[in-house]
UniProtKB/Swiss-Prot annotation:
Zn(2+) binds at residues 157, 177, 179, 184. InterPro entries: ATPase_NBD, N-acetyl-D-glucosamine_kinase, ROK, ROK_cs. Belongs to the ROK (NagC/XylR) family. NagK subfamily. Pathway: Cell wall biogenesis; peptidoglycan recycling. CDD domains: ASKHA_NBD_ROK_NAGK. The gene is nagK. Keywords: ATP-binding, Carbohydrate metabolism, Kinase, Metal-binding, Nucleotide-binding, Transferase, Zinc. Signal peptide: none annotated. It catalyses: N-acetyl-D-glucosamine + ATP = N-acetyl-D-glucosamine 6-phosphate + ADP + H(+). ATP binds at residues 4-11, 133-140. GO terms for biological process: N-acetylglucosamine metabolic process; peptidoglycan turnover. This is N-acetyl-D-glucosamine kinase. The lineage of its organism: Bacteria, Pseudomonadati, Pseudomonadota, Gammaproteobacteria, Enterobacterales. It comes from Escherichia coli O139:H28 (strain E24377A / ETEC). Pfam families: ROK.
Amino acid sequence: MYYGFDIGGTKIALGVFDSGRQLQWEKRVPTPRDSYDAFLDAVCELVAEADQRFGCKGSVGIGIPGMPETEDGTLYAANVPAASGQPLRADLSARLDRDVRLDNDANCFALSEAWDDEFTQYPLVMGLILGTGVGGGLIFNGKPITGKSYITGEFGHMRLPVDALTMMGLDFPLRRCGCGQHGCIENYLSGRGFAWLYQHYYHQPLQAPEIIALYDQGDEQARAHVERYLDLLAVCLGNILTIVDPDLVVIGGGLSNFPAITTQLADRLPRHLLPVARVPRIERARHGDAGGMRGAAFLHLTD
């Protein structure tokens, strides 16, 4: 059995998958925020419960936000303070007496989608998350591409390209990002960015679901906003595709639930690509909230 953990700032979610990659059981507990020992205990107790339930010693994979293992073997995860700065993989491997694998949660999302039965035909899969932030991952022949610093797929921290500024206006504000840089595309293409753009142009502080509801009702202002957002997304994605050239792009995160994101994006891309480039297949993520657990479990299928 394959055990996949999706660990965030508020919850530890475990999913148990069989050899056919089907979910058999899941459980969630709160993430301890202050005590590393309590954090380790929470993970180990879930593993012990799964081992007992299924009568086996399952493999363990963990997806977690941040850098899973720095050069000194410690985790960097600002949203999981109890474990950040600790040798999490080594400690769990020792306590559980098995090989524990860690990866960035966005890589686990991309891996989950790449291992979907409909998508395994594609050698290079790009996962793109349009949610609270913007991130993603790259999967080549079923394996995550992580890079030296585990920042492969941090698409949200690319800066706005020149043609985006031309489109939006040269006085368009380069917002300061939480990473310390200015003009990161996350500030404009995330769910929060979607709402910020609307307020910037129309001076109304609406949230993304409210704007989308207006769009569905045929509101002209909301429709103009979505057109502008999709044009901006196409410019930024075109730059990424020119570098990555994937066979498939799978879009997840809250904004992926808005059908226009996947249905109206492909037609906008050719003008932002090289003439010889082909637009990849673009699909909405298949596995929703289970994607993180699923991808983490499948870290043991990448050998």
